[in-house]
């Protein structure tokens, strides 16, 4: 009788793992050590777990349970949220079970982004604790619950509609339920398709408002999964593109509401006149002016022909970037296109106009039609280079569709 013994885990492994589709890869007659075989068993188990999780995600019964809300804040407020040696943010994480991260503190960048992910209850509780932490750090431990504060959430453009609701119905409903005031910026932030949603109120009101906002986004994800997969270009703080303005007032996080945000807000806040149109002479010295008259003699990236299908107005409004960075100057350009091609520029379900916005980072607003006018006005706002690229893309789209229509008209039946 042989005295040699073998562990059950090794001898039974070839028969037990055959149930899994991820079978062990072992050559016949090959000597395999116990450690190698155990590692192979773990590999198979991990693959099986991954396949089960994939199947769970694909099942119709699986519904999203977590939401992701981002808050834009100043660097000094982000440091208050983190707390001394990370004590404050660690306490918020432990008490809410939410995952909280803060973007890197980059030198010269005045803003940071707070990322909060979790269930609706956890996210709302986390934001309630965040605003209370901001008030406590300003010395309002006793009556901080009665002081109003504002936070700025970053919401992708395609999700803002579900928060606003039809004719603002959902926005007003959240205000009534929470006693907070909500302000949705009408335009996208530059170089992204994020919009600002400002919540103003006492900590309890912000807590309740963020809960209903999270719930609204979660319901939208479940009801319209196809719309939720749209690609988002998230706002990234830079030293050239600052959204928030710090007035050095305690207990306030302020930004200019209901207009397109730009970095000149801080620079021009102490000047009597903002965004004055610059004369053609001055424009030619600072940033090249893009007009049908000047484009024929233009250099660099501009082609040597008149831009077809687009009428470009002279004298764009320029917002100078900090430090006189000419390439980062923001311009607001007015152009006109033929009324007949407005639908072509927009595209089905806004596909083409959104593509131009995403590829250039510009904000493009199509004004309402004017009775009796054969042209439609478009307002393009972005960096100088990006706005010119947007104009070229719009012109190119009209030219292609015009040529296709002409070809169909001439082709025999």
Swiss-Prot record:
Interacts with PAB1. GO terms for biological process: regulation of gene expression; regulation of RNA metabolic process; telomere maintenance. The keyword Amino-acid biosynthesis does not apply. This is PAB1-binding protein 2. Keywords: Nucleus, Repeat, Ribonucleoprotein, RNA-binding. One of its GO terms (cellular component) is cytoplasm. Residues 1-23 have a biased composition (Low complexity). Residues 1-36 are annotated as: Disordered. It comes from the Eukaryota. It comes from Saccharomyces cerevisiae (strain ATCC 204508 / S288c) (Baker's yeast). One of its GO terms (molecular function) is mRNA binding. Present with 1590 molecules/cell in log phase SD medium. Residues 66-130, 148-213, 330-394 form the KH domain. Transmembrane segments: none annotated. It holds the Pfam family KH_1. It is found in: Nucleus.
